[in-house]
Amino acid sequence: MNLHSFNPTNRGINLLWLAAIALLVSGIGFAENSYGAAAEEIDTSANVAMKRFYKQVKGAKEFVRGAKGLLIMPNVKKAAFIIGGEYGEGALRIGGKTVGYYNIVSGSFGLQIGAQAKDIIIAFMTREALDGFRSSQGWEAGVDGNVALITIGAGERVDTRTIKDPIVGFVFDVKGLMADISLKGAKFTKLNK
């Protein structure tokens, strides 16, 4: 390298690319294998996520009864080192029965490092919202439909009378509902399972 042509801007960009490649090569990749989880594994994980949801969120069972469909994305993994990404697979259920499998993919850029897992439940409260999701080739939150994320404090309950949004989301981990979360830009795509 010629010292007279050294450009710190190029070096910074190269370091970002190197970090992104290292993240992918290091095995922090999101899919457990190139085919993803089997349908039975997804259903089992979705059942566990729903049990956790019912336990952590008061009024959740009553709220779910009013939904036309639920997209349950258990154990969505996020990893980041400057460039971040998120991936998970889940089940769309109507009337308590799985009618399809989907993945979630999103990315981010900025000062971030670490890894975490969370569950996401998206409730389609109207037939129109559910049909719009099901008929899309790749549904993007914030573009194809707005997801109203519910954040309630400990001990509070979901009030089915005050929530009027057609699409409602809950993001939680083992500690409970997560605040300051956005699904905007997350893309959901139907899987062939």
List where the protein language model places each region.
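N-terminal secretory signal peptides that target proteins for export/translocation
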Residues: 1-11
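A ubiquitous, low-specificity "background" feature that marks scattered single residues
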Residues: 8, 16, 20, 150-152, ...
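Intrinsic-disorder-associated interaction segments
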Residues: 9, 13-14, 35
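Bacterial N-terminal signal peptides
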Residues: 15-29
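Small-residue-enriched, tightly packed secondary-structure blocks
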Residues: 34-193
